């Protein structure tokens, strides 16, 4: 994980060069306290795919404590990841609280997301998922 604000900003800045299907990327990173930060941004891919993201980072603990990743195509929400707890949904227990919202019924159709973690940024994982979608189009 990232030791500092500067490490995290440097990581975000390299994504555009490391993933060929990202056409443009905009992001902002804010320090919310001496040891915590918040990022928000948008990546645009080919095939009119867009990824909006936010990550809340505790630099002292070297981990995320909240995140959100939302994929769109032509303005239509395709899927999203969040760690909002749903303790009464036993189907999500295997990777609590990490899960993915998918169609049909995007808001209520949730599946476990074992690839998500608080131990590091999940952006590379979601970018690879979008790249796989692009390759299958």
Protein language model features and the residues they cover:
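UBC/E2-like fold recognition across ubiquitin and ubiquitin-like conjugation systems
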Residues: 1-50, 104, 108-137
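Detector for Asparagine
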Residues: 3, 54, 88, 95, ...
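Amphipathic, interaction-prone secondary-structure segments
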Residues: 34-75
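Intrinsic disorder/low-complexity signal
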Residues: 54, 81, 128-130
